[in-house]
Amino acid sequence: MFNSSDSSRLIRLQVNGEARQCAAHMALPQLLESLGMNPRLVAVEYNGEILHRQFWQETEVQEGDRLEIVTIVGGGVFR
């Protein structure tokens, strides 16, 4: 059950090997935005598994989660 006082609680997680804190019950896209990332331009490994974009909105980060976030960069050959 959702408790409004619980929403102000901070949880600890690891993002790209660094300890971070965020609000409890934060959905993954909101976490990405709070980190200054464009959710449309990243890929996410969530606790050791690639998390498909279709599941991001329903995924709330939890205490102790481990995320690896990779920015997608277009490019080509530089000459």
Please report, for each region that a protein language model flagged, where it lies by residue.
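Ubiquitin-like/PB1-type beta-grasp interaction modules and other compact soluble beta-rich domains
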Residues: M1-R79
